[in-house]
Amino acid sequence: MQETQRLAVELPGLSLKNPIIAASGTCGYGQEAAKKYNLNHLGSLVLKSTTLYPRQGNPRPRVCETSAGWLNANGLQNVGITAATNEKIPWLRKNYPQLPIIASAAGFSEDEYVKVVSEFANTAGVKAIELNVSCPNVKHGGMAMGTDPEVLQRLVKQVVKAALGIPIYVKLTPNVTNIVPLAQAAEQGGANGLTMINTLTGLSIDLKTRRPALANVTGGLSGPAIKPLALRMIHQVRQVSSLPIIGVGGIESAEDVLEFMMAGANAVQIGAASFHDPLACPKIAADLPIVMDRYGIKKLTDLWEVRF
């Protein structure tokens, strides 16, 4: 079997050469990551979460390292939907015409989400849209819409209409008692897939200043610390939903990728690993067939049948 066949993954709107997707917020709009490596090594990438208008983000410092990951409170800093659709995405299409683009829509009201999704849906090259309803470090909006199943279902219904057939993947927050009702709400609202999980709200304190390490006080925890939680939540949701799941949370190796797919994910995103190694995504993609051979895995999609 050819390597391309072993690694290929088909999801709604996305034909991926491999399951490795650069997570939103780790590669900007592609131009930043392209300075480090050839983006064609990826299955896909998710653009920076984009709002209706440009945002400067939260005060600095916004990022700090923890013992098992990172805390970030960027506050949805982005160029706004007009610049994203008129400048950023055309650059990606011109330089990487074969790379499937996943846009990421964020907002502070249902109306804003609908407008952003509508603009992305009318932009050539966008193959899928990730709905970021789980950002833990902005006030008013963001995660607030992703913690109430009824509100989430209503929002998803509206953005699915605005998407004009472009698949919608809802990025779920782990900052809830039970993530399953949120997954079910997204599915009932018409979502084509789920991305899980986003970061967990955390706090780090600077002993010298006796103040929080982040100006925003709290931030989103990512990295190896959240991997077991992500695996558990993906497994929980897979028991009740057949929607495609893109797993994310602490993945740092090809072995981690296989764990996520055995837990119920159909593809994965690499996030925090790219902070300490900008080449994490292409390295993991290159390692996958080697590790698959080690564990006797002929093709990745065989792991979709794993159940426990």
Swiss-Prot record:
Enzyme class of the recorded protein, top EC level: oxidoreductase
HAMAP family: DHO_dh_type1 (MF_00224)
Keywords: Cytoplasm, Flavoprotein, FMN, Oxidoreductase, Pyrimidine biosynthesis
Active site feature: 135
Molecular function in Gene Ontology: dihydroorotate dehydrogenase (fumarate) activity
Pfam family, one: DHO_dh
Family: Belongs to the dihydroorotate dehydrogenase family. Type 1 subfamily.
Protease found in the keyword field: no
Underlying gene: pyrD
Highest taxon of the lineage: Bacteria
GO cellular component terms, semicolon-separated: cytoplasm
Lineage summary: Bacteria, Bacillati, Bacillota, Bacilli, Lactobacillales
Functional summary from the UniProt entry: Catalyzes the conversion of dihydroorotate to orotate with fumarate as the electron acceptor.
E.C. number: 1.3.98.1
Positions of FMN binding: 24, 48-49, 132, 171, 197, 223, 249-250
Assembly behavior: Homodimer.
A Gene Ontology BP annotation from the UniProt entry: 'de novo' pyrimidine nucleobase biosynthetic process
Catalytic activity: (S)-dihydroorotate + fumarate = orotate + succinate
Protein name: Dihydroorotate dehydrogenase A (fumarate)
Subcellular location field: Cytoplasm
